[in-house]
Regions:
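Conserved small/polar residues in nucleotide/adenosyl-binding loops
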Residues: 89-94
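Glycine-rich phosphate/diphosphate-binding loop of Rossmann-like nucleotide-binding domains
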Residues: 3-41
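A sequence-level detector of short, solvent-exposed, charge-rich linear segments
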Residues: 24, 40, 44, 65, ...
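Glycine-rich phosphate-binding loop
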Residues: 49-87
Length: 94
């Protein structure tokens, strides 16, 4: 069975960070789903998604959110699947 990739954003403003990854997954015909889940605004929803990800057919979780790595950490704390944090470069990074 081919497992899906979960592409998780902390908010819709993180879309520019993940749209290239989604385009590449689509081009390679790799099944994926993109979701907006916040470690701060919707922590219970994020935790539940992570806990049930394997049972829902996911094999890896990509997380991109703001200037901090909290989202990837919140997901990694709630799943045994690989979680990859995608950094968002901002004004604070020089």
């Amino acid at each position: 069975m081919v497992r899906k990739v979960a592409v998780i954003m902390g908010s819709d403003s993180d879309w520019p960070v993940v749209k290239g990854a989604c385009a590449q997954l689509k081009a390679l015909d790799i099944p994926f789903e993109a979701h907006i889940l916040s470690a701060h605004r919707t922590p219970a929803g994020a935790a539940e998604f992570a806990k049930s990800a394997r049972a829902n057919g996911f094999g890896v979780i990509l997380c991109a959110a703001g200037m901090a790595a909290h989202l990837a950490g919140a997901f990694a704390a709630n799943t045994t699947l690989p979680v990859i944090g995608i950094p968002k470069i901002g004004r604070a990074h020089v």
